Amino acid sequence: SSSILCDCEAGLDRYVGPGGDESVSTPDGRPGAIIQLHIPKFWKDPKKLEKAALVRISQNILTCPTASCFNLMDDAESYFKLGKKVAFFGNKYQKRIERFGRKMWWIPILGGEFIMDRRLGYADGLMGGNLWYFGKNTESALKAAEKGVEAILPIPNVITTFPGGIAGSGSKAGSDYDFTIASTYEKFCPLLQKDPSVEGALPEGVNSVMEIIMNGKDMDSIITATQAAIEASKETEDLLMISAGNYNGKLGKSFIYLHPDKQPS
């Protein structure tokens, strides 16, 4: 999902516990998953993150058979009392409980029970890390991007939010239409390079551009993911170049360099 038109950007960080990253245990000892939700800081409204989390938990986690919902950020200074809001699904049969040494809400459901921590913490993260893959054809650009995503998946604290981790419709900020905030990046559309109204910017021979977008817990996580993706994909056949969208520095103050030796320490 993209915050261009969605309520947040969400994705799977990693599986944890049995069968996953066993350095992280779940409160109930079962297999689990860490999920990240992000909204842009320029929205300046944490309540939008709370609403997005409420909708996603209520519709995607509460409904999932045998699932529970735990707060990973126990030390976070900021938090939402989301457990109480989700618990209203219990229609007055819900109740406060303590389990696994945690303060939780208990909701009776047809499958048995759903339990959830009373509070979910939140903190600043990083959005919009990206890589562009310039291919001789669609197959090469897509194959390179797929290799990049595969390398990112095992890295902790990072998510890729688009289908399969890849965007085939990379956008620019702004539009000629006032009802949307982003639009196709015509300078980099292969089929518009000969359009006289477009100032084409694609290198010679490029016929497809695929993009990976990364969000994460912090700068170091995104840097690690970026370098892993580049290393895994750079030798792809018919891949002509790897670059990234800078957007004239308008979308944020954090800069990640594709050449690791140029990244400030």
List each model region and its residues.
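Conserved mixed alpha/beta catalytic, RNA-binding, or beta-rich assembly cores of soluble enzyme
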Residues: 1-24, 39-42, 46, 51-209, ...
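Glycine-rich phosphate/pyrophosphate-binding loop regions near the starts of catalytic domains
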Residues: 23-36
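C-terminal binding/interaction regions
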Residues: 233
